[in-house]
């Protein structure tokens, strides 16, 4: 009916808005690292003023709270990507998949807000930060986690499509065709992330060789 159609019409804009707000939060944390804002506890514990810019930026996800924020940013990014590039999808399937994706994001957002706030403050702020774990000061930190997360989180899109298809009662060859590009993209990102991580672990002596 008309009510259902209006709810379906809201799914795309809501997904875009969710991504926008989460991306702003991620940009704010990145800016705190780049500008060495040590009033943010996360920055004070994982960065310092003399650190090269690459490791200041990579330090954003070199800790528990920041890596969770990166995870949720990528989760919202995939939902936004479906909004932009999924115009050929049946409206009902698309809106349900976006709703499932949004609910997953809400779960992670609640976890961050309740247990892992990356914006916890330090008063008064220290003059300098503690710096990053020396083993993480490596180009691998800049590339391995983002690719790995693009792979891990990308598969949530396949899950969302699966739940949407079950709700619609249309798990068929057409559904498999619609979900294939998103699954392949996640698989490629995850493969790249594992290769980069294996290479990083191989030449980092303390980690004892290849990791899979």
Regions found by a protein language model. Name each.
Residues 1-212:
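Polytopic transmembrane helical bundles with strong interfacial aromatic enrichment
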